[in-house]
From Swiss-Prot:
Record-given protein name: Probable nitronate monooxygenase
Coiled coil: none
Source organism of the structure: Staphylococcus saprophyticus subsp. saprophyticus (strain ATCC 15305 / DSM 20229 / NCIMB 8711 / NCTC 7292 / S-41)
Enzymatic reactions: 3 propionate 3-nitronate + 3 O2 + H2O = 3 3-oxopropanoate + 2 nitrate + nitrite + H2O2 + 3 H(+)
CC cofactor note: Binds 1 FMN per subunit.
GO annotation, biological process: response to toxic substance
Keywords: Detoxification, Flavoprotein, FMN, Monooxygenase, Nucleotide-binding, Oxidoreductase
Pfam families tied to this protein: NMO (PF03060)
Residues annotated to bind FMN: 71, 175, 180, 219, 238-241
Family note: Belongs to the nitronate monooxygenase family. NMO class I subfamily.
Gene Ontology MF: a single term: nitronate monooxygenase activity
Top EC category: oxidoreductase
């Protein structure tokens, strides 16, 4: 078994290791370090304005001339329903008051934001783009392919993987249920729930059904996870939580400490924080929101309704009222540079393969 795969060839990287596009937690330093170490660094641009994204890309290009990716959230067709928003605002009012937070103004601008981001990655010559929450329109895919930009889809089921391949993605992330942060799902099960299929189950089933390369994600923290994924047929891995505690991560010390102190049983998948299912460390905010007796507003509305509250809690060092996205392998986190992390992953993988 070799670490040279179709993924390394398509992305023009040394190692089949992708740093997940963790919106809100990536920095140009993290992305550049991963790319310079031989992996594929990713700008988590899901929440960025076009101005902010341009700044990030421009600075990143000063730090590396190696391939990197930009991760974008595919906009949804969810509607703004005033009654839902009013009810949620009433529920959040006492908690906002406790943190001295004003009621936010909701901006339904994600479609324009996505369009601007696509135009920008083309203009700036970004080597690769990964997508979360769905598949972009065919015109967008064709426009990116004309510029030879590599496209990375996200799937939480075989059905979603097939859809990604049919749409023209160059490779697909098999996001297992162990993964931290938002579920990349864009389909629902018969019970109208997001698919929650473990990485070990998802990867080989996906590999058997599609021809484009599969990249395993979810709970992968070290060389053991890389080798195991490749044995299952994956041609690379995407790691998120492992990079959250790295020196270059944009995660706060509060956040890093919470992950370091948590156990594999401490995370839950919930939609109460942003309106989309996401895996994070269970805390008081989630407990309180679970008492809400109405339907949670959809993403991006719920995300905007709770955003300022979560930010202020984090600023005040209160881990109980912010989001703490994390995968199910927190006992395996390490505190080191992203470069050292990649070196360790590769070294351990090679040792295992050479036994």
């Amino acid at each position: 078994m070799k670490l040279s795969t179709r993924v390394t060839g398509l992305l023009n990287v040394k190692y089949p290791i992708i740093q997940a596009g963790m919106a809100g937690s990536t920095t140009p330093e993290l992305v550049a370090t991963v790319s310079n170490a031989g992996g594929l660094g990713t700008i988590g641009a899901g929440y960025f304005s076009s101005d902010r994204l341009e700044q990030e890309i421009t600075y990143l290009q000063e730090l590396t001339d190696l391939p990197y990716a930009v991760n974008l959230f595919v906009p949804s067709d969810k509607l703004y329903i005033p009654e839902k928003v009013e009810h949620m605002n009433a529920w959040l009012k006492p908690y906002r008051r406790a943190f001295n937070i004003e009621e936010p103004v909701i901006n339904m601008t994600e479609k324009q934001q996505f369009k601007d981001a696509i135009d920008l990655v083309i203009e700036k010559g970004v080597p690769a783009v990964s997508f979360t929450f769905g598949i972009p329109e065919q015109t967008v895919i064709e426009k990116l392919k004309e510029r030879h930009i590599k496209l990375i889809g996200t799937a939480t089921s075989v059905e979603e993987a097939i859809a990604n391949e049919s749409a023209g993605m160059d490779m697909v992330i098999a996001q297992g249920s162990e993964a931290g942060g938002h579920r990349g799902a864009f389909s629902e099960t018969a019970s109208q729930l997001t698919p929650l299929i473990g990485t070990m189950s998802l990867v080989p089933q996906m590999v058997d059904q599609i021809n484009i390369p599969v990249v395993a994600a979810g709970g992968i923290m070290d060389g053991r996870g890389l080798v195991a994924s490749m044995v299952l047929g994956a041609e690379g891995v995407q790691m998120g939580t492992a990079f959250l505690t790295s020196d270059e991560s944009g995660a706060s010390q509060l956040y890093k400490h919470a992950i370091s102190q948590s156990k594999e049983t401490d995370t839950v998948v919930t939609n109460v924080i942003t309106g989309k299912p996401a895996r994070g460390i269970e805390n008081e905010f989630i407990h309180k929101m679970n008492e809400y007796d109405d339907e949670i507003p959809d993403y991006p509305i719920q995300n905007q309704l709770t955003n300022a509250l979560r930010k202020e809690a984090a600023n005040k060092g209160n881990a109980q009222w912010t989001h703490l996205w994390s995968g199910q392998s927190p006992r395996l986190v390490q505190h080191m540079s992203a470069w050292a992390l990649i070196e360790n992953v590769v070294k351990q993988a090679n040792e295992i393969m050479n036994r």
